[in-house]
Each structure stands twice: as structure tokens, then as C-alpha cells.
Amino acid sequence: MVNAPLAAPLTSPYTRPVADTSPGIDDEAQQLFTAGRYYATRRTAEGLRQAIERLERAVALKPDFAAAWAELADCYALLNWFIEPPPPEAWQRAKHAALSAVSADPLLAEAHASLGFVRLHYDRNWKDAEHELRKAIVLNARNLVSHRWYAYSLSAMGRHEEAITEIERAREISPQSPVIATAVANVLFLAGRFDDAIRQCHKALALDPGGVAAHTILRWAYEKKGMVPEALAAFEQERVFAGETPTTRAKRAHVLAATGHLEQAREILADIISERSEKWVTAYEIAIIYSLLNDRDNAFFWLHTADQEHAVGFTFARVDPHLDNLRSDPRFGELLRSTNQS
């Protein structure tokens, strides 16, 4: 087993403030926590696995180690972005860890942020998510993650101006963070402000030219603007930095459908669905592609699948511009009501 540097500088743009070491924390538990955070900042599948292994050992040694529980909750939650397919128990374990963090230290901002994140994406309990994220900000107003997740929760609820204000607060705290710059672009895109999103993506990419998420949001905005050459070029940049994966292939089908290359998109989509058991792609992306192809029946089938699988993108179905083709269909309103999004 390769050991992480126990005092490695945490300079990743994803790093969030964390409570100072408490005098009573067991030395070994503290070392495991520090190593776990080091691996977690890598934001890769293997990094998250390594982080979880160490954080689980830390809380086993010190069951009231709130900061370790909060970090563990985030790692389990993030498996839903970085593992394909996500482990089916990831969200349940994230929820257990977040609740354990709050129980261990009700005044730890990170604990409430972690629980708010679970309430948003797993429980889809908007009221509780907002309560937890706002409490996290009250406890630590400089916690970037709390501001970012709260902004996303506001976007998901359709409260776009509030979301923009909230994410701008994060940018004021860390103006050079490419993660926050990308989050600003994402919030603008969800608000339908595509020109502003394009400008913001370029700012984010100036900070981190390899930021896959910024390239993705830039492509989305170009698609919505009907800027076909630009959208296709943005996808090629995505592909360069993300590599050839099943998700990248789905993104290819997405951009082809959005730019009018319908038959090519259908061919790729058929392969994606037939091979999904071996080459997993989130059901939410499949639903979006069907929406772009104006195949409503299949789009709704896959949206229901996304709900059942707790696909993270489904949290934003209410406001996602990719689903605009479906909004006039009565089934869309029924779907939102049945999933607590109306």
C-alpha cells in the first residue's frame, strides 16, 4: 500500500476549509484523516477509494471524529460522479456519514454542508437541503463548498437570481479558483443566460485550460445558441481532456443530436443502450439525448430510470435547458410532482 504524505499541502481547487484538529483526536485517527483528505483532493475514482479506506479507519478509531465523518460523506457522495456505474450503496453511506458528522459536532460547518448535499441530491428534500446549507454558511461564511452547493440547490429550485448572487459570494472569497469560476458558468447556464455562460467559461478556462466541466458547459451553451461549429469544437476539447470513455461517447451523441446530426446520434445512442450493462452511461444523459432527438416517449422512460437510479443530473430536471423539448408535455409536470420537484 502506498502511503500518502501525512502533511501534504492541500492546494487543490477543490479543497475546502476544515475544522482544526481537536486536542482529543487520536494521533493515528488524525493521520488517517489527513491522508484521506490528501487522496480525496485528487477527485479521481482511485483517489476517492483510497480516501474512503483511510477515513473509514479514522472513524473506527474515533467514532466522534466529526470532520472525518464529513469528509467521508463527501467521498461517498462524489463516487456518484467519478465511478461508472456508481456503487448502489454510495448515497446511503454518504447519508449515514453526514448524519454521524452532525451528531458528533452540531457546530461543524462541514458536517451541515455534507448533510445538505445529501438532502439535495439523494433525498431531494429542498427545504432540508436549504436549511443545512444555510446553517453551514452561518457557521463558516468562508466555506467555498457550502456556497457552491447552496447556489446549486437554489438553481435546482428555479431561484436563479439568488443562485447567481450566492455563487458570486464564493467568487469574492476565491476569485482565482477555477472550480468556482466553472460553477458560476454552470449557474448561469441553468438560468438560461447562455451568452454570459460562454463568457464565464472562457474565464474559467483561462484559469484551468484542462477543466473538463468548463469545456462541457461551454459546449452546452453553444448548442443552445445554435453555434454548431463552436459546439463541435468544444466537444473535441472535452474529449481531449476527458479521454475516450463511455461517457465521452454519450457526449458525442449529445452534441450530434443538438447540432442536427440526428442519424449519427441515433446510431451511437443505440450502441450505448445495448452495451450499458458493460459500458455504463448515466440514464439522465440518455434521457437528454432522446429529448434532443424529440423522442419524448423514450426520454420520459429514461428520466424515470434516472430517478430510480438517483442520477445526480436528475436533481436539475426542473430547470435543465436540455429538457426544454419536454416541458409542454403533461408527463413532464407529472414527473416533477411525483419526484418532489414541482
Predicted regions and their residues:
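Beta/coil-rich, acidic/histidine-enriched accessory regions frequently appended to metallopeptidases
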Residues: 330-342
